[in-house]
């Protein structure tokens, strides 16, 4: 499936996860992160089903999508999933962002900011006063976003992504 319109100016909405979203979310995760950092279907499913999990999905509204139908391409207007966030609250004290995934072609359109702020509000409504996350030390776009949202680096986690011998920053924010 190919998105034919220019995403940067697209309208989008954020909604709760539905089980029918799973395959799309997994495919987005595979596109966003290299093998060894991206999650298996089993891992992703366990995060979504975790007790007190929050999974929010960003959909681009009324996008023109090219679909192959009986051998020919057809343009269809549809809402498409362009990103998601998964988090959970721990004993209703603090939250953890497990993953934030935005399709490469949908980045810098505000989806990450909106998903994170909506997720933080949900965590706060569950009683969380802080939220934590980890991100690769070389993931500059994520670091810029998280700093813009008020996250601070707490410490470096050596070889957090062991399959890539890559360190991560643990970051936190008070809600």
State each model region's role.
Residues 132-134, 147, 152-169:
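Conserved catalytic-core motifs of GNAT/GCN5-like acyltransferases
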Residues 113, 166-174:
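Accessory recognition modules or surfaces
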Residues 99, 103-117, 124-126, 130, ...:
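Conserved glycine-rich acetyl-CoA-binding loop
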Residues 5-12, 16-105, 116-118, 122, ...:
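Acetyl-CoA-dependent GNAT
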Residues 91-93, 139, 161-167:
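Short acidic/glycine-enriched loop/turn segments that link adjacent beta-strands
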